[in-house]
């Protein structure tokens, strides 16, 4: 058992426009060099663009749907047993699911070739809400890896 102190979880304030904790976390992950206002403007304009293209009522509904389609259920972790390393499938906790989904959406948006970051993020969110796009492919890839290593599930700790 570790002797270190248990760190206190920092409270992230909800974002000013939609009062959403998830969106606030998304803004923090997108942010570069502490420029939060830039990250906020990128996300808000991307959500407005997505709402124009979509048949949904609110952009938060679409954002939630995009996150749901990207959230992983299982992932693999390396476990060393008797000189060989196994990829052991483990279930992902809710907080990590959200974080991974957000990270993958932002990562996929940055790799796109659209003109501005707003446009790239809008396209990635729209694709993710429809169950396609690179972020959804990443999730399916992780699930496939966990499925193929199911035989090592008994090494879970």
Swiss-Prot record:
PANTHER family: RIBOSOMAL PROTEIN S7
Similarity comment text for this entry: Belongs to the universal ribosomal protein uS7 family.
Record's protein name: Small ribosomal subunit protein uS7
CDD domains, alphabetized: uS7_Bacteria (cd14869)
Subunit (UniProt): Part of the 30S ribosomal subunit. Contacts proteins S9 and S11.
Alphabetically ordered keywords of this record: Ribonucleoprotein, Ribosomal protein, RNA-binding, rRNA-binding, tRNA-binding
GO molecular function per UniProt: rRNA binding; structural constituent of ribosome; tRNA binding
PROSITE patterns given in the database record: RIBOSOMAL_S7
GO biological process, one term: translation
Task of the protein: One of the primary rRNA binding proteins, it binds directly to 16S rRNA where it nucleates assembly of the head domain of the 30S subunit. Is located at the subunit interface close to the decoding center, probably blocks exit of the E-site tRNA.
